[in-house]
């Protein structure tokens, strides 16, 4: 199977939401040599890169026990953008933490690229998270004393891995941050900082990027820019993205939206707009 991906133009802002501009001067690129090959979707469904099987998560005991997740079985497609939504206490954040290996289920199994991460010891799980899962957080989590270049490369340096210069240049050009590489976080806008965080997540070519409210601290313009970048990472680089959000406008950028309520997935939606999604959440 070819490892090159056919670039797809960035999709327009979702219907019912503001017209978010794409970053200026961000060209489309094929995936570099050595990038993972992704299976083509079957019957409109992408092959799963992450799977939860009969996953439950309980906190506390007795009358104080909380059932955060209840027997959840769901797969996340390779090369697909999935958004997870739901009210506070619905289980969406717990699901994200468990599928990313940040928390363990009370029962059930979690698979990343076919590996049962619930069976891994702490050392192996830490390595898998470092090598195969990219994280993008609401608070950016950049090191304030390092410039953008050093922040992007930091996880690979800590892992003792050698960065691929061509891949680095490709990501930087695609995200439009080439003129900010020498700047520290305090010298960048929120949108620029989040672009650096996305570049850091992409640098190791992870199996999946997990984004936790990635636009929660951004204004509307920066929100649109970051969502276009995540969308392009899927369309142009074959990246898999799983995002937790409360915002229907950002969720509408996804290929698929899971709606959680009372610890269960109650809706599995495709081809949504911001307006139709808002209506389904009422």
Predicted regions and their residues:
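N-terminal acidic, proline/glycine-rich, low-complexity intrinsically disordered segments
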Residues: 1-11
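Generic cytosolic/nucleocytoplasmic N-terminal low-complexity/intrinsically disordered segments
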Residues: 3, 23, 32, 42, ...
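Conserved beta-strand-loop-alpha-helix hinge in the C-terminal portion
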Residues: 264-282
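ABC family nucleotide-binding domain
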Residues: 47-265
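Primarily ABC-family ATPase nucleotide-binding module
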Residues: 37-49
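Long, intrinsically disordered low-complexity tandem-repeat segments
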Residues: 19-38
